[in-house]
Swiss-Prot record:
Keyword Disulfide bond: yes
Cellular compartment(s): Secreted
Predominant cellular place of this UniProt entry's protein: secreted
Name of the protein: U7-lycotoxin-Ls1h
Keyword Mitochondrion included in the entry's annotation: no
One cellular component (GO) term of this entry: extracellular region
Length: 78
């Protein structure tokens, strides 16, 4: 009887761990999402890229976005 209960509890624990792991995989940030650090959990093949914003020579903070790895944005020449 104890063996059956132990086996049932072990099986329940394994199923719960698999479910939690599957939910965590879906929690990544998609392309274009705002991230906070360079390792912020963007989905696979995406990188958190940050840049500093300036308005009239005054720094207005830093923005970070999930973009494809290797992609570089540059300022548009006017």
């Amino acid at each position: 009887m104890k063996l059956i209960i132990f086996t049932g509890l072990t099986l329940l624990l394994i199923v719960s761990l698999i479910d939690v792991e599957a939910q965590n995989e879906g929690a990544c940030l998609p392309r274009g999402s705002v991230c906070t650090t360079n390792h912020a959990g963007c989905c696979s093949k995406l990188t958190c890229d940050c840049y500093r914003r300036f308005e009239k020579g005054v720094e207005k903070g830093q923005k970070c976005w999930c973009i494809p790895t290797g992609l570089k944005y540059s300022k548009k020449k006017e």
